[in-house]
């Protein structure tokens, strides 16, 4: 039975995180930015699970923390989308550059 090496998990996590970071920094659509942030959180979860499984002392702590992170990410997505809907009703746009509601 062949096992996937830790470097494969870490490489995939780095690629996912870089794609998410690039999208979060370059895109102007708020929905896309939220999706990219979720992608970055999933890359962190992949690291947690990989180190939990392939670390020096394998245990379920990383997996439990990953589940907790997913619950927090779901709450973050729900709150972010609720704020986005409220801003869209006021401004009729979802572009980051035009979100200046808090300016005096």
From Swiss-Prot:
- In the UniProt record, does the keyword DNA-binding occur? no
Highest taxon of source: Bacteria
What Pfam family is a match, any one? Oxidored_q2
EC number(s) on file: 7.1.1.-
The record's disulfide annotation reads none
Which catalysed reactions does the entry list for this protein?
a quinone + NADH + 5 H(+)(in) = a quinol + NAD(+) + 4 H(+)(out)
Q: Which UniProt keywords apply?
A: Cell membrane, Membrane, NAD, Quinone, Translocase, Transmembrane, Transmembrane helix, Transport
Name the InterPro entries for this protein. Answer: NADH_UbQ_OxRdtase_chain4L/K, NUOK/Mnh_C1-like
Q: What is its main location?
A: membrane
Membrane topology of the entry: Multi-pass membrane protein
Q: Where in the cell is it found?
A: Cell membrane
Q: Name one GO molecular function term.
A: NADH:ubiquinone reductase (non-electrogenic) activity
Q: Name one GO cellular component term.
A: plasma membrane
Q: How does it assemble?
A: NDH-1 is composed of 14 different subunits. Subunits NuoA, H, J, K, L, M, N constitute the membrane sector of the complex.
Q: What is this protein called?
A: NADH-quinone oxidoreductase subunit K
Classification lineage: Bacteria, Bacillati, Bacillota, Bacilli, Bacillales
């Amino acid at each position: 039975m062949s096992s996937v090496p830790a470097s494969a998990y870490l490489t995939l996590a780095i690629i996912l995180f870089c794609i998410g970071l690039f999208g979060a920094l370059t895109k102007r659509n708020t929905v896309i930015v939220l999706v990219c942030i979720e992608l970055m959180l999933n890359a962190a979860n992949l690291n947690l699970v990989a180190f939990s499984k392939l670390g020096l002392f394998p245990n379920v702590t990383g997996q439990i923390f990953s589940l907790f992170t997913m619950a927090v990410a779901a709450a973050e997505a729900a709150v972010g989308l609720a704020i986005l809907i409220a801003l869209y009703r006021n401004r009729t746009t979802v572009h980051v550059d035009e979100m200046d509601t808090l300016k005096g």
